[in-house]
Amino acid sequence: MYKLLKKDGSSRRGEFSTPHGVVQTPVFMNVGTLAAIKGAVSTEDLKEIGCQIELSNTYHLSLRPGDEVIRKLGGLHKFMNWDRPILTDSGGFQVFSLSGMRKIKEEGVYFNSHIDGRKIFMGPEESMRIQSNLASTVAMAFDECVENPAPKEYVEDSVKRTTRWLKRCKIEIDRLNSMPHTINNKQMLFGINQGGVHDDIRMEHAKIISDMDLDGYAIGGLAVGETHEEMYRVLEKVVPNLPENKPIYLMGVGTPANILEAVERGVDFFDCVMPSRNGRHSHVFTSYGVIHLLNAKYELDDNPIDSECSCPTCKNYTRAYIRHLFKAKEMLAMRLCVIHNLYFYNNLMKEIRESIDKGNFLQYKKEKLEKWNETV
């Protein structure tokens, strides 16, 4: 259940109550695709750096270790030792990214495993059953993610199919939640708005799925080929057509600057692999933009990554030391940078929430973007 606490322009400050705890929004979901953050970051680390909610992937976990294995071990929370909310992606984005290996039918999608090439089928019911086995807090509806740009006629047909699939997802999750052996019989369902960069399709689809009274609504099919300006325009068209009393999630986005722009347009939830992926490659976010620790100028730099940061990495280690670890190919280098980047993102969201509470979000956003000098 979502409670809107404060609005500052279109930006929203809220609370999302779940069976696994309350999430303060706007929020960044830390991405643990295979039930772990890449970079040797533990769930204890995540709590220390302020992570409220974690995201894992249905498709990948269904292949390895298998959703039945996780079900038999008590569900994803118990499996990964995490007692806070978890959102599971439906697997749709991963399936549709296998463009040369899949066939879309009304019943679902036929594709080949990226691991061993075996043939797999996934449709709305299969996705819901896998997510029920995982026992995540929030299950995402199975949808088709169309890369931008795409022919309008195809996008229209795809959105209609996604709507039919959403109805099937809702029927199936209601059935699964009513069954006695279901681990989490209060699993929530978020629907996904699609429509590419076509405003009319997006707005009509938002109105249709809003009538289905879901637990939350995501905006998908962005950050897949369109410009930032197109993304922001789509948000301005879609968000006002979604229910104000439900959380709004922008999938797979993005940079800190993207997040600020989307919060200004009313978005509550975000996820992106960028902080962990960039950290593993020695790129770290700071109060003054992104720096690359492998640059020679950091060889004798005994400052922390960011003097304004309070993360465990910045409290204890220098740029020179972390650069040495990368040069020596020590795993600790990746761990320290991923922890720092995730702290940066989670702390950014905390500051955003505080700025909305104070009614000065736009001023906060302006100062941040100027300070980052558009490098974030």
UniProtKB/Swiss-Prot annotation:
It catalyses: 7-aminomethyl-7-carbaguanine + guanosine(34) in tRNA = 7-aminomethyl-7-carbaguanosine(34) in tRNA + guanine. Zn(2+) binds at C309, C311, C314, H340. Transmembrane segments: none annotated. It is an enzyme of class 2 (transferase). Residues 252-258 are annotated as: RNA binding. Pfam families: TGT. Its cofactor is Zn(2+). It comes from the Bacteria. GO terms for cellular component: cytosol. One of its GO terms (molecular function) is metal ion binding. Pathway: tRNA modification; tRNA-queuosine biosynthesis. The active site is at D89 (proton acceptor), D271 (nucleophile). One of its GO terms (biological process) is tRNA wobble guanine modification. Its EC number is 2.4.2.29. PANTHER family: QUEUINE TRNA-RIBOSYLTRANSFERASE. Catalyzes the base-exchange of a guanine (G) residue with the queuine precursor 7-aminomethyl-7-deazaguanine (PreQ1) at position 34 (anticodon wobble position) in tRNAs with GU(N) anticodons (tRNA-Asp, -Asn, -His and -Tyr). Catalysis occurs through a double-displacement mechanism. The nucleophile active site attacks the C1' of nucleotide 34 to detach the guanine base from the RNA, forming a covalent enzyme-RNA intermediate. The proton acceptor active site deprotonates the incoming PreQ1, allowing a nucleophilic attack on the C1' of the ribose to form the product. Belongs to the queuine tRNA-ribosyltransferase family. This is Queuine tRNA-ribosyltransferase.
